[in-house]
Amino acid sequence: MIKIPSDFKAFIFDLDGTLADTMPIHYKACQLVCNKNGFDFPEEYFYQEAGKPTIEVFTNLMQELEIKGFNGSELGQEKEKIFLELISMVEPLHIVADIAKSYKGKIPMAIGSGGQRKTVELTLDAINFNNFFDSIVTCDDVEKYKPDPETFLKAAFEMGVDPKDCVVFEDGNPGIEAAKAAGMMVVDVREFL
């Protein structure tokens, strides 16, 4: 069972790998794009970059692997298209989803995701969590991505809650860093999955 810090007034949930079991499907989509183009997407790198926008991840991957002739933005968009074709396979991560269900309507709750808005909304639909949240902040809504705290600070602002009174549920190191930098309490859900 997940231990929730006391003295909270609001929850902010990361989506991919926290509220929804999307990470294996995102990785599969990444692999399909890379394999189609003749290279591999290292699984360790994928999980290290968890929480960052797809386009940024692919752009960084091209640089890190010194792969020339590919546009990280185009590959990222292609990966998102493939993910959306596979989205019906997404299930909620029940240990976290049950927390959201039990607090629905009792406290303000938000999504703070590094995903694109369209993908986030379709993922929430796939797991039947649309209309659960007072705020949804995606990479389309901020200038700086996780590990910068902007995503979570914007979610707190939109809920009208002081950042120090928010608990963030996260599965990625960049998101955990972002929550701490925002002065929020954070639950690393990887300990419970």
Task: List the model feature ranges, each with a label.
Residues I25, E49-P53, E78, E91-I95, ...:
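Short beta->alpha linker loops
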Residues F39-F41, I67, F129, G160-V161:
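Helix N-cap/coil-helix junction residues
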Residues L84-I111, R117, E121:
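Short, acidic loop-to-helix structural element flanking the phosphoryl-transfer center
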